[in-house]
Every structure is written in structure tokens, then in C-alpha cells.
């Protein structure tokens, strides 16, 4: 537990942040209506209206997650609910280098949502322990290295992080960039190592409440909503009312009966991953079973992913200073900028270190070695060294060098040694989503519910054009500027990139033309079916 002074300080800072997510507004009848500004989801408990119940939550937290159970008439530990697990699917077109063409791949990412009150508990501890983490890495001298999930970076974002890397490459001129991606990072975090680093950050043995958190996040359980629907033959479309909680979908009268039913039917799954992980170099005969994996998506998981690698960050940062290379880590993405003659050695040693000491693997297909060197015209360009080595070439010339051009991709941007661009896949995804939204809007306009004689395009403009606030386009335009104002009205440095501005220059023309085209197509179809006589106005 925290000292009383620490707790009050942490509670004040976190509760002010949290309360901003709740708002009371007037409904159409003029009555007060509660509005949650955070995205909602159905879980085992009802949504928690923080402004009214914050004293209840504060008492639980101040007591170190101990509460009085009226039914049992005893003081007990807080019982964390199972997480709700979903599979987030993202379609992406990826270039298959060996086959020489693009293929559609679907990236599947498991995300775990905590119950509403559990999420607030995780949120408070994440806020409090982040203060401890920030103090620790500042004291140890590597606070500039980890970039993701930070609270003490002066409102910097990926624009500034990427610019720093690209500026470092420009400063060095001839150099190489090594980009590494940790495979399934959250799913492979070793529990013993995590506990060891957690203790190091707070400077003491885990207090009982934090040990309870540690157990909740390493021995976590989860359910799948789809599994519940299939098991109990529930068709959401045929229900008279939307379920208030997941328990409404489970047969039984009392909540404890429903939880028991879920356990008996094996719909509550517990994380019990363990395996014998052998180190290749330091101790090849170590056959100790290692337990691993934490839920990705909980309020604590992001912070723990940084805590896990505190010694890795410190070691690589010290080596970077001694050997004159540049190191940054954004969660599971590692980036090194170094002299080209040292690149291969540094790459191999970092891959070995993270495997031997942290039981993590680097995805081979995502290892990128990009060399920045003058082309035949003396202009610094980015070369794909993996492709060049596979082709058996030690050098390129004016005839073949363009075959090996490949920009460095980092945090949504591309740098070819001369110009900075928005990552091409990000731009493609933006246009794909824009067209999808246009089609959906036009179809709705011509449906039986579309009573107006026009297409409501305000939402499209808000989400997919420069006219909106805080969308992809405004972010990209901010990146293209020399300076811009962020959401807090603070002046921030952009990339001053004419190339990005050129990439975005036709977006509004494409949007308007697509809207007009889809409107015409839908009208002709409806007219042919005898269901429309007049084209909708755009």
C-alpha cells in the first residue's frame, strides 16, 4: 500500500482525470441525462458512474483492495472479474517480398477488457505506479528511451518521436537503421521477471494490494462473448431487450449460480501458459518451467510492458552512449541508428540479449536493416539491405539501385533519406475507410428510413476531411507543418514536409467525387428496382 500522503496525491491526480470522462447533459425533454465519454461495452457489471460513486471506490483503494462482505460478514480481498476477450481483426495489404506482389493479410490481436469497476482499479494503480516508474527511469538516466504509454514526455506524440529519429539519420548522413519487432510481446512476458522488475521500480517487496494486482494480471481469466452466445443459443437480434450485463445471457437466477454455470461449462478460461524455455547461450541446461503472459488491454498492461524492460532499456542506452549509436523503444518496436559497419553485430547481439535474458523473440520477417548512403547521383537514399544481401550484392550502381530503395518505416511515417511521407499503408487504410463510410451513408439515405431528399455528409466530412477535428487528416496535416497547435493549444514541432502535403492534396476531391459517384450508382439501382424516383442531393 502507498503511504497516506502518497495515496491522497495519487487519488487527487487520477480522480480529476477520470471525472472528465463523465458529463451531465440535458436530454430532449430538458431533463438531466448521464453521458459517458468513454466507449462502453457489456461486461459482468453495470457501468460505474464515477461522480456519484467515487467515495465508494476511494474507500476500497485506500483499504488496499480489502472490503467488508455483508453476505459473508467478513473482510475480504476484492474479487476481480474475468476479462472479456475479443479478437481485433485488421485487414492489411502487405508486400510479399519473396513472391513480388501484395497479399491481403488479417492481423489478429487479442484484447482483454476489464469489468467496469476493475478497469477503474487498474486505472488508479496504473496512474500511481507510473509516477514511480517515471521517477525510477529519470534517476537511472534513460527516460528518453521508452516512448510508448508515457506521462512525462511534454505532450509529445509520434510526430515528434519520428522526427527525432529522422533528424538523427540526417545528422549522421551515412548510417544504418535497425528496426526490430518483439513477437507477441504481452503474451510472452515472464511472470518472475515482471515481479522482479516491479519490485525494483517501487524499491520494496510488493505490498499485499500490489501483489493482489500482480496475481490478477498474471493468473487472469477471461470469457468470450461469442462463446457464451453459442453455448446458450442466444440470438441477440431476437431478444426483447439488450442485455445489461453478460450475466443476462447465462441461464440461472442468482449471479453466483451463473458464474458457477460458466465455470462448469468451461467458458471461463484461466491463463496458465507455461513451458520450458531454454536459453541458447548463457544456460542451455536450464529447464525451469516459465509462466508467462499478461492481458493486453487492461489499464495496467501498458505500464507493465515498460516496467518489464527497464534493465534492457538501461543496458542498451548505456551501450549506445559508449558505442555512439541511437536507441529508442516504442512498446514492442525497437529502433537503432548506428554506423553501418557495426549494424549487423549490434542487431545480432540485441536479438540474443532479449531472448536470453527476457525470453522474448524477435519476428524474423519484421527485422528491417535499412542503410542510408549516397546513390549514384550523390543523394542520400534508404536501401533495403536484406534484399540486397539476398541478391548477393555488396554494392549497387545507377542501373540497379532503384530496385533496392526502401524507406524506413517508423510510427506511421516513412523516410527515404531525403523526404518524409505518411506511411503508404496508413494512407490506403484511410481511403478504404472513407469509401466504406460513404457507401454506408449512401445506402442508408436510400433505405426505407431515409426520409430526407439529401445525403447527410457532415459526419463524413468530420471524420474523413480536413474540416474535422482530431481525425487522421488533421493529424497528417499537423505532421506536414513546421509548427502546429495540439489539442491542449500547445505549440509543437512538425516535420515541415512538402511530401506529406502533396500526399494529402487531393483527399477532398477524392471524397467529393466518390460521394457523387456512389450516390449516382445507388440511385440508378433503386430506380431500376422501382424504389426511387429522385436522386438524393449531395
Regions found by a protein language model. Give the residues of each.
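Short, conserved non-catalytic motifs in the polymerase core
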Residues: 83, 87-123, 141-153, 233-251, ...
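Right-hand nucleic-acid polymerase module
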Residues: 115, 119, 123-125, 259-292, ...
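Helical (often loop-to-helix) elements that flank the catalytic cores of nucleotide-handling enzymes
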Residues: 338-364, 384-388
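Beta-rich nucleic-acid/ligand-interaction surfaces
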Residues: 144-155, 335-338, 368-378
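Conserved polymerase palm-domain catalytic core
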Residues: 172-331, 335-349, 402-405, 447
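A short acidic-Thr-Gly-centered motif at the start of a beta-strand
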Residues: 157-177
Amino acid at each position: 500500500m502507498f503511504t497516506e500522503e502518497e495515496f491522497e496525491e495519487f487519488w487527487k491526480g487520477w480522480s480529476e482525470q477520470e471525472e472528465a470522462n463523465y458529463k451531465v447533459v440535458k436530454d430532449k425533454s430538458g431533463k438531466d441525462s448521464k453521458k459517458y465519454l468513454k466507449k462502453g461495452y457489456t461486461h459482468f457489471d453495470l457501468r460505474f458512474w464515477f461522480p456519484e460513486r467515487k467515495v465508494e471506490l476511494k474507500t476500497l483503494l485506500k483499504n488496499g483492495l480489502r472490503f467488508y462482505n455483508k453476505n459473508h460478514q467478513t473482510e475480504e480481498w476484492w474479487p476481480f472479474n474475468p476479462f472479456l476477450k475479443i479478437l481485433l481483426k485488421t485487414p492489411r495489404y502487405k508486400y510479399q517480398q519473396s513472391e513480388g506482389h501484395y497479399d491481403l493479410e488479417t492481423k489478429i490481436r487479442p484484447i482483454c477488457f476489464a469489468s467496469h469497476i476493475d478497469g477503474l482499479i487498474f486505472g488508479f494503480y496504473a496512474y500511481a505506479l507510473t509516477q514511480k516508474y517515471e521517477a525510477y527511469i529519470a534517476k537511472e538516466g534513460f527516460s528518453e528511451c521508452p516512448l510508448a504509454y508515457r506521462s512525462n514526455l511534454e505532450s509529445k506524440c509520434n510526430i515528434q518521436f519520428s522526427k527525432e529519429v529522422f533528424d538523427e539519420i540526417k545528422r549522421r548522413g551515412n548510417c544504418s537503421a535497425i528496426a526490430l519487432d518483439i513477437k507477441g510481446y504481452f503474451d510472452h512476458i515472464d511472470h518472475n521477471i515482471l515481479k522482479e522488475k516491479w519490485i525494483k521500480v517501487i524499491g520494496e517487496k510488493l505490498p499485499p494490494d500490489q501483489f493482489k494486482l500482480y496475481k490478477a494480471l498474471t493468473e487472469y481469466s477471461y470469457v468470450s462473448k461469442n462463446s457464451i452466445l453459442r453455448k446458450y443459443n442466444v440470438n441477440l437480434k431476437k431478444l426483447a431487450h439488450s442485455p445489461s450485463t453478460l450475466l443476462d445471457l447465462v441461464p440461472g437466477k442468482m449471479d453466483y449460480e451463473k458464474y458457477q454455470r460458466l465455470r462448469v461449462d468451461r467458458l471461463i478460461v484461466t491463463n496458465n501458459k507455461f513451458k520450458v524455455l531454454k536459453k541458447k547461450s548463457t544456460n542451455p541446461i536450464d529447464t525451469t518451467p516459465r509462466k508467462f503472459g499478461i492481458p493486453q488491454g487492461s489499464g495496467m498492461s501498458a505500464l507493465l510492458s515498460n516496467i518489464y524492460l527497464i534493465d534492457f532499456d538501461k543496458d542498451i542506452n548505456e551501450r549506445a552512449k559508449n558505442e555512439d549509436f541511437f536507441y529508442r523503444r516504442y512498446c514492442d518496436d525497437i529502433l537503432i541508428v548506428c554506423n553501418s559497419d557495426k549494424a549487423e553485430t549490434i542487431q545480432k547481439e540485441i536479438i540474443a540479449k532479449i531472448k536470453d535474458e527476457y525470453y522474448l523473440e524477435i519476428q524474423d520477417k519484421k527485422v528491417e536493416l535499412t542503410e542510408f548512403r549516397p546513390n549514384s547521383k550523390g543523394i542520400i537514399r534508404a536501401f533495403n539491405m536484406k534484399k540486397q544481401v539476398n541478391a548477393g550484392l555488396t554494392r549497387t550502381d545507377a542501373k540497379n539501385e532503384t530496385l533496392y530503395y526502401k524507406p524506413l518505416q517508423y510510427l506511421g511515417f516513412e523516410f527515404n533519406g531525403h523526404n518524409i511521407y505518411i506511411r503508404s499503408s496508413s494512407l490506403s487504410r484511410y481511403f478504404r475507410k472513407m469509401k466504406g463510410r460513404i457507401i454506408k451513408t449512401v445506402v442508408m439515405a436510400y433505405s426505407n428510413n431515409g426520409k430526407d431528399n439529401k445525403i447527410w455528409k457532415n459526419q463524413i466530412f468530420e471524420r474523413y476531411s480536413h474540416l474535422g477535428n482530431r481525425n487522421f487528416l488533421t493529424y497528417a496535416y499537423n505532421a506536414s507543418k513546421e509548427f502546429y497547435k495540439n489539442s491542449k493549444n500547445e505549440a509543437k514541432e512538425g516535420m515541415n514536409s512538402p511530401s506529406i502535403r502533396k500526399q494529402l492534396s487531393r483527399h477532398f476531391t477524392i471524397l467529393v467525387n466518390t460521394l457523387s459517384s456512389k450516390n449516382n450508382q445507388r440511385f440508378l439501382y433503386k430506380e431500376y428496382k422501382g424504389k426511387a424516383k429522385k436522386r438524393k442531393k449531395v
